[in-house]
């Protein structure tokens, strides 16, 4: 309903304004697993209502420490997972994958949803941008979630890219540097 949409817009704008105020002295140690579990728990009921499978695949060994702001990282995961649910279909899947290399962690969120046309991909991280609204009028959103994701990934020293095929789904792939104390193990 309209009141819910307005509340979501205000919340997203507040999130964006907070990003400008983040400083590195706010950083803390946290694990990607804890953040992933929190984001998944917040969306469990929605996934059930939409009849979309929501899963975590962790090939890291289970203790992937990162230095950053855990609440911001959770919001990154939440926004990507939520989009994967919203732009999917009953019987579809959304998978959050955690893996690691020598000096970095890779986090991906992949869905089996409707996909994003290639012509739209250069714009998806812009504030208030929504992919071809004529296709998605019934899907709620403010067009700010992916902008929050991009800024949050950048704050953590990471990178993000997207691979998508219309009718097959989308995958967002993020890479985050391991903290020096982790990379040297």
Question: PLM features: residue spans?
Answer:
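Short helix-loop "hinge" at the ATP-lid/N-box region of the Bergerat-fold HATPase_c
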Residues: 84-85
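Short conserved segments within the C-terminal catalytic ATPase subdomain
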Residues: 46-57
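Conserved glycine-rich
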Residues: 157-158
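Conserved micro-motifs of the catalytic ATP-binding
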Residues: 21-28, 65-68
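A conserved beta-strand-to-alpha-helix junction within the catalytic ATP-binding
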Residues: 28-44
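Short alpha-helical segment of the dimerization/phosphotransfer core of two-component systems
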Residues: 1-6
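Short conserved segment of the HATPase_c
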Residues: 116-128
């Amino acid at each position: 309903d309209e009141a819910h949409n307005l509340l979501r817009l205000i919340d997203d704008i507040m999130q964006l304004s907070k990003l400008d105020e983040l400083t590195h002295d706010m950083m803390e140690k946290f694990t990607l697993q804890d953040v992933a579990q929190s984001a998944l728990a917040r969306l469990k009921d929605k996934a059930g209502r939409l009849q979309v499978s929501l899963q975590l695949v962790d090939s890291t060994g289970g203790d992937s420490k990162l230095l950053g702001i855990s609440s911001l990282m959770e919001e990154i995961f939440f926004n990507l997972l939520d989009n994967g649910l919203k732009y999917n279909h009953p019987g579809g899947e959304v998978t959050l994958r955690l893996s690691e290399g020598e000096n970095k962690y890779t986090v991906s969120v992949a869905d089996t949803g409707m996909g994003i046309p290639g012509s739209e991909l250069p714009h998806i991280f812009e504030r208030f941008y929504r992919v071809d609204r004529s296709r998605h009028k019934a899907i709620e959103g403010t067009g700010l979630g992916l902008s929050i994701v991009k800024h949050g990934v950048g704050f953590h020293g990471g990178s993000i890219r997207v691979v998508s095929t219309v009718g097959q789904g989308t995958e967002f792939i993020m890479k985050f540097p391991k903290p020096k104390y982790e990379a040297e193990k």
